[in-house]
């Protein structure tokens, strides 16, 4: 994250709005009927002239020194970027990092967080709605306060195809080939099984990911 130069002490709210813009609200798409349409505030974009030369790593306090056993690591990243295996008492791994990266990649492409905590049951509910039921072997090991049987029930009818639907609804400007590239990357990056999740090396060599990078990053 870029460092931000401080405002002058006598700066008014109007001065700050002029420099940063007013907070913009975005509608939260929902595949189910809700009592009230949801909204979220769009993340702040800091102008270049307010950035400092300092740069900060947002590691959520999870950075580890080389040689430190993974099993000694405490804590987890924020829930909406945390892999579901970590939320079921599985140890941290590089596969967990890849899940978090995929959340950021999806948010950049979709301009929307794929998994959030606004639904009943929290972030796991939205993960299940988008990706389908969790592995049954995880049942009983959820670290949160509330666990739901339908999260692990393979017969539960949920929005199994909503990952593709989310891509199509959030990026109607994209063509079918591009949407298929994005779906291919996200399906493998969001695999429930850490061993089957894309590694960083595999992602960089993936033809679908490279096609997207070539288009948007030159």
Question: Where do the PLM segments sit?
Answer:
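C-terminal lobe substrate-recognition/regulatory segment of protein kinase catalytic domains
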Residues: 61-68, 131-185
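Regulatory extensions flanking the kinase catalytic core
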Residues: 188, 194-218
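Activation segment/activation loop of eukaryotic-type protein kinase catalytic domains
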Residues: 1-77
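Structural recognition of an alpha-helix C-terminal capping motif at a helix-to-coil junction
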Residues: 109-110
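Conserved region at the C-terminal end of the protein kinase activation segment
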Residues: 62, 67, 86-92
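Conserved catalytic-loop aspartate of Hanks-type protein kinases
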Residues: 97
